[in-house]
Regions:
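Enzyme catalytic cores with a strong preference for nitrogen-chemistry domains
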Residues: 1-321, 332-343, 348, 368, ...
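ATP/NTP-dependent adenylation/nucleotidyl-transfer catalytic domains that generate, transfer
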Residues: 170, 231-233, 287-324, 328-620
Length: 620
């Protein structure tokens, strides 16, 4: 059997665009003599549509598309993902009509029949994720819901499709995304299909990429192989590519559509560099596979490019503050890689505290990237603000409030530049700064997009190296990239906000990077978990132990002082994070609508206080 795998760049909310793309690939697959063409989950309107799924007029458009696609199946079997609804009189949990995340299967203008002749041409997603940025149960009922309400056994709900072409019958199992990741659910669609002895399983997905996601999927495939042994069947995994967003998180899809043999080995693979592709594979042949390097760099570039194309359709200039620090240097390079230097304008807005070397770095970076660049001083604005505050009986103007004035004035200027240039602002914050509130509201928290908002500082350092490798030039000044050995970091020029004399960022780079990930990555941990690890001495076995020793945190008093500062900073910054721009998500825990936060103060409960006292007494 020849299968065309269509790794589609799905444009959320753009039904006509997606249908046109599908039709082109179907026509080409017919010319290539494919028997079946497979598209990703929710490929007609997008997967991350939020409450657009609740609008009847939009749902009506999606439903009409199913009949259109079915009419295209005269010469080829078509499998695609979209919404469907049944049992309209019963109603969903929210009182609206039922909606199902569905895999459709049509051939010769008809629905492909199932072995039990029930719900021909339709398979409902059974495992609905409700963790992280997934919220499936808000919008859909599951195949399990349908089976229970209609008194149908799961083996009949999860039933093989009988595809007959050229006098050859193939028994195919269809799944939708999470059905493959069924370990924590009450149903295992893969196991049921194996029991049905299907010829192979096709899993259609819109699975967002995060770091090492491909390794997690390979692990899950191997788990299925271990469970079923020789009974396991080949599996065709078809994923989306490109970018979709939920408002607060910009998610990238790497594609990486793969055909797995029954023993879990890879038979064939499409690109995993986030780009659209469509190829025809013969299940009886083997193909070369490949792995994309610098995947994080690729992900950020694609996120910016697709966000610009899909969301900012008026093609604005991208306005960026270039301080000469590593975050803004990396971001301006990412913008140029994604959009071209002609779409980017850089501004250096110095005060008396900005050193000549950082101003020179900003200038040189812009020059090497051929970016339109302007430099000026904010001193007059700072002085005018001081004078105004004095009129309101605030004198002297100093301390943190004075530092924030500088940051907010820069935000004000960037907003003005963007207004006059018809542009949007690129946010320069990284994940650690966002976690600890090391940013000024309405100052450096503004922007249309935060490319680095889910990247730790150590990841930003690695991105800087990758960018220099990409350009084969020192785009990011080497003095900004520290020398890092195990548990030791040496800067040519240490990170600084440059809002006062001799200022250095207060973060313990390496350790705090790890701690942010530890507290936010799904499934997340809390301070009590970490205190118990420290108290038991198990921290010495963690990957962060060398950093803790480097910063003197093997001393219990220093450790407690630091963790209390960390947690208080974390909680006091929640109100800032809520107002942060959309973040490009690249980890298993991103601020926004991934790791969801309520505004709650840092409070040490009785158990936490007791454990802290035990640690301070040296009873570890």
């Amino acid at each position: 059997m020849k299968i065309a795998i269509a790794q589609l760049n799905i444009r959320s909310g753009q039904i006509d665009h997606n249908l046109n793309s599908m039709k082109q690939k179907i026509d080409q697959a017919v010319l290539d003599q494919a028997d079946i063409i497979v598209f990703p989950e929710m490929c007609v309107g997008g997967y991350l549509l939020s409450d657009l799924f609740l609008q009847k007029s939009y749902i009506s458009q999606l439903l009409k598309a199913n009949d259109l696609i079915k009419s295209w199946s005269k010469d080829i079997g078509i499998i695609w993902g979209n919404i469907s609804h049944f049992d309209e009189l019963k109603g969903n949990r929210d009182g609206r009509y039922n909606r199902y995340n569905t895999a459709f299967f049509a051939y010769q203008g008809e629905w492909v029949k199932k072995e039990n002749n029930h719900l021909n041409g339709h398979y409902f997603k059974h495992c609905l994720p409700d963790y992280r940025f997934f919220d499936d149960s808000r919008y859909f009922k599951s195949g399990m819901d349908y089976a229970l309400e209609n008194h149908i056994e799961l083996k009949d709900s999860i039933n093989p499709f009988i595809f007959e072409k050229d006098h050859q019958i193939t028994r195919i199992g269809l799944e939708v995304c999470e059905d493959l990741w069924s370990k924590d659910y009450n149903v295992n669609p893969t196991a049921i299909y194996v029991d049905h002895k299907v010829d192979f399983i096709i899993n259609i997905s819109s699975s967002p990429w995060t770091l090492n996601k491909e390794l997690s999927r390979e692990k899950r495939i191997k788990e299925h192989v271990q469970i079923h042994g020789d009974k396991m069947v080949p599996l065709v995994y078809v994923n989306a590519c490109g970018m979709q967003n939920n408002g607060k998180n910009v998610l990238v899809f790497d594609g990486d559509s793969t055909i797995y043999q029954k023993d879990g080995r890879v038979l064939a693979q499409l690109n995993d560099d986030f780009n659209e592709d469509c190829q025809v594979f013969d299940l009886k042949q083997t193909y070369q596979t490949h792995i994309t390097h610098n995947k994080l760099l690729n992900a950020l570039v694609v996120a910016i490019r697709e966000f610009d194309q899909q969301v900012l359709t008026f093609k604005p200039k991208w306005i960026i503050g270039l301080s000469g620090g590593i975050d803004s240097s990396v971001n301006v390079a990412l913008l140029c890689m994604a959009l071209g230097s002609d779409r980017v304008i850089g501004y250096n807005m110095a005060s008396r505290y900005n050193q000549a070397k950082t101003k020179n770095i900003a200038y040189e970076t812009a020059k090497k990237l051929n970016v339109e660049y302007y430099a000026g001083s904010i001193e007059q604005l700072v002085q005018a603000t001081e004078n105004t505050l004095i009129e309101y009986n605030i004198n002297p103007v100093e301390g943190l409030a004075y530092e924030n004035i500088q940051a907010r004035l820069r935000g004000h200027l960037l907003s003005s530049f963007a207004s006059y240039k018809g542009g949007v602002i690129c946010n320069n914050g990284n994940k650690v700064e966002c976690a600890l509130g090391y940013a000024t509201l309405y100052g450096d928290t503004i922007g249309a997009l935060s490319p680095l908002g889910d990247c730790t500082k150590l990841q930003v350092f690695e991105l800087a190296k990758s960018i220099n490798d990409y350009y084969q030039d020192e785009i990011i000044n080497q003095n900004l990239i520290p020398s890092i050995t195990e548990g030791k970091i040496e800067f040519g020029f240490a990170p600084s906000a440059e809002l006062r004399d001799n200022q250095i960022d207060p973060m313990k780079w390496g350790y705090h990077d790890w701690l942010v990930q530890y507290f936010i990555q799904y499934p997340s941990h809390n301070i009590l978990d970490w205190l118990k690890i420290y108290q038991s001495g198990e921290w010495r076995k963690t990957e962060v132990a060398s950093w803790m020793i480097y910063y003197g945190l093997d001393n219990p008093k220093a450790f407690i002082e630091d963790i209390r500062w960390f947690m208080k900073s974390w909680h006091s910054a929640i109100f800032k994070r809520i107002q942060f721009p959309p973040i490009v998500t690249i980890s298993r825990g991103s601020f926004g609508f991934d790791y969801r936060e309520s505004q709650i103060p840092y409070i040490e409960n009785h158990e936490t206080k007791e454990l802290i006292e035990t640690i301070l007494k040296g009873e570890a």
